[in-house]
């Protein structure tokens, strides 16, 4: 074999080795998605989205008669959306302001403290965040509530938003800020009216990724929101969520089919959010 042929052989061997090991990581993911879709699509209908979780008796009677389990996860969907919305109201402004500070004051002593705390929170198990929210909100209020659940989710969203904001602002050319200051604008005006709008695509992507990250959390909500069998709009009362319903269905053999349909809904919701985030990031980079 000539030297050129040997190098070509090595290149092809390396290429196909990379493809093989990449497929090893992708195959389990596709198998999981296929399993969830195959077992979950049967329960997906209009009632699944507008009715609350079924009782054990109704599920048992339906299974014995060979019918679809009645009811749905409307209480979980409304609870998830409500708590994520409240968590976003808390985490988005705080996270953006924190990211702006880290990007604009990289050498400040307080910046190192914020970075350390951000990394610490991001690496903490979700159950620990739930315990913190329990001691901060549940115990003082005397009951589990949607506010407590949203507090736990907001804490988990903060590191992602702070980091994405910081990295996005660092990618902006320094001439933007210099031009604004040269025109006589105050530093605050430059940040609010120039830097943040210019970084909107990156900020929006980070926010969507943070939301998709917390939508599937169960452990912190078990210690804060607890769950509810009905649709509850009172933020001071226990509230359900889709991950909590999946856990409840798991503990009832008669509701096993609802696990797959609920998982499919949650999987598709998070997948859509991630696709939107990727598209926004792609358009922002090419703009």
Language-model region placement:
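Transmembrane alpha-helices
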Residues: 187-223
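Transmembrane alpha-helical segments of polytopic membrane transport and secretion proteins
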Residues: 1-24, 277-287
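C-terminal transmembrane helix and the adjacent membrane-cytosol boundary/short C-terminal tail
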Residues: 166-170, 208, 248-287
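Generic hydrophobic transmembrane alpha-helix motif, especially the helices
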Residues: 119-155
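Transmembrane-helix boundary motif in ABC transporter permease subunits
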Residues: 86-118, 278-286
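Glycine/proline-centered hinge or cleavage motifs at structural transition points of membrane proteins
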Residues: 125, 183-184, 197
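Periplasmic/extracellular loop-to-transmembrane helix junction in inner-membrane transport proteins
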Residues: 2-12, 16, 35-87, 107, ...
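Interhelical loop and adjacent transmembrane-helix boundary motif
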Residues: 60, 221-267
């Amino acid at each position: 074999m000539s030297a050129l042929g040997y190098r070509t052989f090595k290149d092809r061997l390396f290429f196909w080795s990379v493809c093989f090991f990449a497929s090893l990581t992708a195959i389990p993911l596709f198998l999981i998605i296929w399993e969830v879709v195959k077992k979950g699509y049967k329960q997906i209908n209009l009632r699944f989205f507008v009715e609350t979780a079924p009782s054990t008796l109704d599920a048992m009677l339906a299974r014995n008669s060979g019918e679809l389990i009645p009811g749905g996860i409307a209480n979980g969907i409304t609870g998830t959306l409500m708590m994520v919305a409240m968590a976003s109201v808390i985490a988005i402004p705080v996270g953006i302001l924190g990211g702006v500070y880290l990007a604009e004051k990289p050498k400040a002593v307080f910046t190192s403290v914020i970075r350390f705390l951000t990394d610490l929170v991001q690496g903490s198990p979700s159950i620990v965040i739930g315990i913190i929210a329990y001691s901060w909100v549940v115990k003082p209020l005397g009951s589990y509530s949607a506010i407590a659940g949203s507090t736990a989710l907001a804490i988990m969203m903060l590191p992602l938003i702070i980091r994405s904001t910081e990295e996005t602002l660092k990618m902006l050319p320094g001439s933007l800020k210099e031009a604004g200051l040269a025109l006589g604008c105050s530093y605050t005006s430059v940040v609010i009216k120039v830097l943040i709008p210019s970084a909107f695509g990156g900020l929006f992507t980070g926010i969507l990724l943070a939301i998709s990250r917390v939508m599937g959390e169960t452990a912190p909500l078990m210690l804060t929101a607890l769950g509810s069998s009905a649709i509850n709009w009172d933020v001071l009362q226990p509230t359900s969520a889709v991950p909590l319903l999946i856990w409840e269905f798991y503990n009832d053999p008669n509701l096993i089919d609802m696990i797959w349909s609920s998982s499919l809904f949650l999987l598709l919701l998070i997948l859509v959010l991630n696709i939107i985030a990727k598209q926004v990031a792609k358009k922002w980079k090419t703009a």
